[in-house]
Structures are given as structure tokens and as C-alpha cells.
Amino acid sequence: MPTWSRTESFLRDWQSLSPEDRRKFKKAVKNFVADLKTGTFRKGLRVKGIQGAEGIFEMTWAKDGRATFEYGPEVRPKNPDIVWRRCGSHSVLKKP
């Protein structure tokens, strides 16, 4: 099971999400975690690196819902550590 943390930016973004958007994000994270175990992300999550932001990735959780993350140092051996950086609309990609 992966470990995870959230940046202050993520926490601010989270507070601005509607309850429906929070539900959608949580559903996408369940799929994301399942895919981490297999090593291949499903196409619907559209996980990819962000150009110009080395080591930072984006995930799509709704039509205009994006989250950014990076891998942190492993807390538990052989379990990835995910640092959630931002979540919100496509605009979060401007400052991932």
C-alpha cells in the first residue's frame, strides 16, 4: 500500500473543491492506488509527466479535474510514496 502526503497548496485547493468534486477525486484515487500495484495506469486517469516540471506528474480525475503529484522517498520498502501537490481545474497545471 502506498504512503502519501499533501502539500499546503493541495490542502488549499482541496478546500475550494465542491463535495461532488471531492467525491470524484477520491474515486479516481482508488483507481490510481490499484494501478500503482500493477505498475500501469489505466487510460482514463491520463497519468503523464508535466512538460517543464521534471519529476511532477498529472492525473485526470474529471473532465476539468486535474491533480499533480510527485514520488517521494519510500517510507515503507517497495511501497511508493505519493506527494499530492495540487488539485482542481486544468489551471492547476500552470503552477504544478
Model-derived regions: residue spans:
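Arg/Lys-rich, positively charged N-terminal/basic patches that mediate binding to nucleic acids
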Residues: 1-30
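Generic secondary-structure microfeatures
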Residues: 18, 29, 33-36, 54, ...
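Noncatalytic linker/hinge segments flanking ATPase motor cores
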Residues: 2, 23-24, 43-48, 68-71
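Residues that form or immediately flank small-molecule/cofactor binding pockets and catalytic motifs
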Residues: 9, 52, 89
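A short, surface-exposed loop/turn module that caps and links secondary-structure elements
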Residues: 33-59
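A short beta-strand-loop micro-motif that forms or neighbors metal/cofactor-
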Residues: 26-31, 77-81
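Enriched for short, Lys/Arg-rich terminal
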Residues: 1-3, 12-15, 57-96
